[in-house]
């Protein structure tokens, strides 16, 4: 009986494999909830709750996501990984009807440097609906993405793997960084002519404190100021629609709550993140 229960537990959590090497304890996100609030014309307030539960295998890979809406199971996604931790397959089942049904499958392949090579999508009938391929030039430090419908994009990187430039057809974006690796801005072009641009500033702890978006004439269209409260562990900023967002962090930097307020100061969205410590293999090169 105990053996049967163990088998069932492994099937549910994706932990059928075994691992006998050294392990350590790391926090993993195990549950996420979203409360959405509605205010009616008569002033009455209502809200619904969406929840996602995550499960991991003994290697620390996220192998299952279960989505709930008002405590009713909505969808289940199962992931499969190779022995290097790359997610090579994702299958989603829709549980919103009377019977669960397959809704989407994604497969991926990687090279020996764990770089994505192909990504294929399949529909309910198992037919491939779209496909993408990625090629790399280590000497030129580029990555080229091509879709099966003829679209393509090439990206250039620096030695720290920061994106320097992207070209997709007649569109181009150029990125800038400071000497600490913070992205300080980007400039977009269409057919060689400047379009939108963005600029950012950071504090001495590499935290963004201001970001501004500019129109093609160089006029400031919108800006966001970020403030931090180290005692409370919060990061706050205004949103484009006049609202305000407050992010809450644990002492170790893990995000545990986000509050989104509208222009009238009413709470609209409440995001909460829950973690559990799980045993995972010790990464190579660490003790």
Model-predicted segments: where are they?
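Positively charged n-region of N-terminal signal peptides that target proteins for export
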Residues: 1-4
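Sec-dependent N-terminal signal peptides
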Residues: 6-9
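C-terminal motif of bacterial Sec signal peptides marking the signal peptidase cleavage site
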Residues: 12-14
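Buried hydrophobic residues that stabilize the cores of well-folded domains
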Residues: 18-287
């Amino acid at each position: 009986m105990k053996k049967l229960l163990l088998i069932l537990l492994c099937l549910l959590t994706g932990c059928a494999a075994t691992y006998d090497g050294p392990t350590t304890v790391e926090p993993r996100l195990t549950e996420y909830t979203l409360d959405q609030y509605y205010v009616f014309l008569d002033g009455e307030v209502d809200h619904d709750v969406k929840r996602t539960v995550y499960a991991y295998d003994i290697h620390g890979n996220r192998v299952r996501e279960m989505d709930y809406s008002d405590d009713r199971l909505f969808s289940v996604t199962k992931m499969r990984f190779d022995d290097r931790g790359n997610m090579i397959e994702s299958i989603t089942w829709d549980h919103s009807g009377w019977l669960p049904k397959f809704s989407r499958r994604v497969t991926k392949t990687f090279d020996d440097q764990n770089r994505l090579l192909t990504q294929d999508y399949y529909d309910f009938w198992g037919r491939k609906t779209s496909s993408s391929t990625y090629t790399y030039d280590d000497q030129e430090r580029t990555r080229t993405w091509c879709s099966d419908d003829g679209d393509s994009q090439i990206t250039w990187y620096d030695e720290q793997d920061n994106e320097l430039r992207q070209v997709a057809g007649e569109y181009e974006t150029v990125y800038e960084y400071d000497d600490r690796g913070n992205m300080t801005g980007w400039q977009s072009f269409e057919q060689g002519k400047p379009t939108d641009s963005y600029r950012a500033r950071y504090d001495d702890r590499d935290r963004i404190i201001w970001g501004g978006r500019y129109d093609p004439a160089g006029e400031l269209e919108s800006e966001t100021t970020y403030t931090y409260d180290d005692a409370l562990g919060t990061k706050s900023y205004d949103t484009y629609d006049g609202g305000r967002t407050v992010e809450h962090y644990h002492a170790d930097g893990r995000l545990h709550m986000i509050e989104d307020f509208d222009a009238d100061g009413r709470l609209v969205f409440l995001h909460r993140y829950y973690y559990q410590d799980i045993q995972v293999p010790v990464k190579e090169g660490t003790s």
